[in-house]
C-alpha cells in the first residue's frame, strides 16, 4: 500500500524531460509493466503519484488546477514533453530558412506529434510542467508550443541537440527562447542597416553595368554577408578584440573589401580599368594576382570602438585559406617575448571563415582545420564560420554536391552549434551574428552560421546559369532583392517613407559615380612580359657568419643535459643524452640532433622565438630529438630549452595531428603574422608532405610573388633511399625544384650536422628582413647518427653555411682529374662511405666529388671555380639515388650543361625512369645502390654483365 507523505513534495523539483521520465516510471510502477529503479520505487511508496498543483490560466482568465493522477493525463504529459524537445531539436525542419522555397515541408515527425494533442489537451497542462523557465505570459502547454514554434520554426533555425556540454546547450536554448536575441532594433540601426544593404547592392550593380563581362563573383543573393561581418567585427571590438582575421573565397570578396575593410570605391574601379590612382597602396607582389584574390588590412572603427581587420590573400583553391588564417590568429594571440611556452590570450583576436555551401562539405581541408580547433597547439579560442549558402556550386546542385541535408552538417561532428538563417531576413541575420559572437567570447569555441540565400547571376558574370538551373533562375529573376524587401518592411513599419528611401538610394549612386570620376584612363605603360623581381630578392641571401663561441656552446650543452631534481628520465633516453656530454670537447663528435638543439638554444638566446610542429616532433620520428622529456613516474613533461639562461624568447614544440595540409597552412599563416619567429614544420616522412602540395604550390612558393606576402617557414622533410619502399624514401625534391624560381625559397639537402646548425642559424638571421624566404630541407634518416655526418665543435663555432662542399682528400692532383662527380644528401655520403671502406680499388686521382648542399639557388660561382682548377676535365656527372625522372636530375641537367661548356661532357648516373619512387625489395635496393656507387667511382669490373639496368650516361 502507498504511504503518502503530505508535508514534502519531491516532485516539485522535476520539470520538462525529467518530469516526463518520472511520470513514465510511475506508470510502470502502477501497471507493473516494467522494472522501476529501487530508489524511485521507494519514493512512489512514500509520496504516491507525482502531483503537480499548478494554476492554469484559461481563456476566460479563470484558474483551474491540474494534477496528473486526478486527470489521468500521464500519457498526454509525456507527449507534450516529447513534443517540446522535438520542436527544440527538429524545429529547423519546419523553418522558412530558404528564400527560394516556401516554408519547409519536411514536417512529418513534428506534425504527427502535434496532431496527437488537441488544443484542449494542451490548455489543460500548466506551462511550468513542461518548461520550467517559461517566460512571463506563458501559462499553458499550448502557449509553450506556440512560443517554441515561433522561436524555432521561423526564418532563424537552430541545431543545438548535438552539443555534448549540457551547460552550453542550456545557455544556447535560453538565449534563443528568452527573446533577448530578437529584441526590436532601434530605428537608427534599422536605417543604418538599410543604408548598408543599399551600398552593397548599389556597388554590385554599378560594377555589373560599368564593367560588362568582367569577372567579379557577385555577392548578390547573400548581400547580408556584409552586415553580418560588420556586426561580428564591431561586437568583437566591444569585447576588446584587437585583431579580427577573415578568410574567404572570391564570392562576394570585392564587396567585403569595399565595405567591411573600407577599400575606397575609386581604388576598386581603378583595378577594373587597369588605371593608376593616387593614394592606392600596392598590396601585391611583382607578378600580382587577380583582384578577387587580394587581401587587405584595415583598422575598422565606429564612434565607440576600433579593431584591426585582416582579410587574407586567397587563391581559388577553395577553403585552403582556412588553416592559414587560424595561424594568423594564434600568432596574434601569443606573447613570444619570454622564455618557456608562449603566453596565449584568445580574447585578443578571433577568426571569421566564410565558406561556400559546396566547398564546406566538399573540401577535406575543412575537416582537417576543424579538427585543429580544440588541440592545444592550434586552438584559437573559437572560430565563427559563415556559410555563404547560395545552394549551387558553379553548375552543380546541392543534391549532387553533398550527402547530407544541410551543407553545415559536417560541423556537427565537431560539436559546433549551428544556426540556419534566411538571408532575406536582415534582422534575423544580425541576431545570428550576435549569438555567434557571444557564444565564441563566452565559451571560446567555434560557432557556425548557415546564411541561406541564392546566387543572382552565374558562377561568374559571363555565365548563363539558366542553362543548368532553368527553373530556379526563373524564380530568382522575379525575386526582389533583400534591400527592396527590407525597404518595404521599414516603410510599412513607418520607420522611413518612400522619399527617404529614395534619398538613400540616390546618395549611394552619387557616391559611386563621384568615385568613378576620380579614376584616370587605363594605363598599360608598365605592362611587360619581363617581370622585374625586387633587387633584394634577386641577389639572394648574402653570406652570413653563423658560428657561436665555443664556451657558449658548452654552456648550452650543459643546460640541455640537465633536468629538475626528482625528474625521472626514461633510462634509454637518459643514455642517449648522456652520450652527448663530451660532444663539444676536443675529441668529441656532434650528431645531427645535438647540432639542432644547440642551434635552437643559440637562436633563442639571440631573441628569436621558435615554433616547431610535426606528427612526432617532440621525440623525433627516428627517436633522435628528445627535446621534450617525459617523467616515467608522473608523465609530466620538461623541455631543457625552457630553462636555459639568457633567453628572452619563447620555444614551443608540438606533436601535430595526423594531417599535413591543414598543419602546413597553419604554420605558414603563423609565420606570416609572426615574421620574427622561426617557424618549422616537420613531416613524419617526406613522402607524406605531398598531401600538402596545394599549400606549397599556392602559398609557400608563390605567396610573395603574387601578394607580397613574405614567409620564412622551414620545411623539414625526411628523405633518403634506404630500402624502405615507395612510401618511406622520397620527399619528392623534384617538385620543390620545379617550383623554384625568382629566389622564392631555398632547397637544401645536407651532409653534416654542422651544415644543419649553420643553415638554421642563417635562416633565423634573415627573419623579418627583406631577404627572408622559406627553407625546404631534405633531412636525414639513417644519416642522423652516421659517422660521416658527425661534426666537431670547431665546425660549429667557426664559419658559416657552405652551399657546396668538396670531398676531402680528393682532387689533390688537379691535372689528373677527369671526372667531376656532383651529388647531394645521402647519395654523397654513400659515395664517401664507399671510398672510406677501401673494399674496392679506385683510381681516385682521376675523380673529384662535390656535394651540392644547397640545390636552389644553385651555387654556380663556387662550382665554376672548382671546375676551373681541373684543366683536363672530361666529364661532369650528376649522381643520385632517385629515379632519373625524379630527384634533382632534370633541374641539374641544364645547369651542368652551362657549367661544362663545349669541351666537357655532362652525364647522369642513377636509377632509370620509374613511375614509383622506390622499389619494395630491400635486397634489390641494396644491389642497385651499390651499382650506382660503383659506376660513379668507376670501380674496375665489367658492369655490363650485371642484370640491373642503370642509366649510365646522358650527353
UniProtKB/Swiss-Prot annotation:
A GO-annotated cellular component: cytosol
Domain of life assignment: Bacteria
GO BP: glycolytic process; tricarboxylic acid cycle
Cofactor field: thiamine diphosphate
GO molecular function terms attached to this record: oxoglutarate dehydrogenase (succinyl-transferring) activity; thiamine pyrophosphate binding
Enzyme nomenclature, EC number: 1.2.4.2
InterPro entries registered for this protein in UniProt: 2oxoglutarate_DH_E1, 2oxoglutarate_DH_E1_bac, DH_E1, KGD_C_sf, ODO-1/KGD_C, THDP-binding, Transketolase-like_Pyr-bd
SMART domains referenced in this protein's UniProt entry, alphabetically: Transket_pyr
Alphabetically ordered keywords of this record: Glycolysis, Oxidoreductase, Thiamine pyrophosphate
Pfam families, alphabetized: E1_dh, OxoGdeHyase_C, Transket_pyr
CDD domains recorded: TPP_E1_OGDC_like
Catalytic reaction annotation: N(6)-[(R)-lipoyl]-L-lysyl-[protein] + 2-oxoglutarate + H(+) = N(6)-[(R)-S(8)-succinyldihydrolipoyl]-L-lysyl-[protein] + CO2
Annotated family: Belongs to the alpha-ketoglutarate dehydrogenase family.
Function as written in the Swiss-Prot or TrEMBL entry: E1 component of the 2-oxoglutarate dehydrogenase (OGDH) complex which catalyzes the decarboxylation of 2-oxoglutarate, the first step in the conversion of 2-oxoglutarate to succinyl-CoA and CO(2).
HAMAP family: SucA_OdhA
Subunit structure: Homodimer. Part of the 2-oxoglutarate dehydrogenase (OGDH) complex composed of E1 (2-oxoglutarate dehydrogenase), E2 (dihydrolipoamide succinyltransferase) and E3 (dihydrolipoamide dehydrogenase); the complex contains multiple copies of the three enzymatic components (E1, E2 and E3).
Protein's UniProt name: 2-oxoglutarate dehydrogenase E1 component
Biological source species: Bacillus cereus (strain ZK / E33L)
Encoding gene per record: odhA
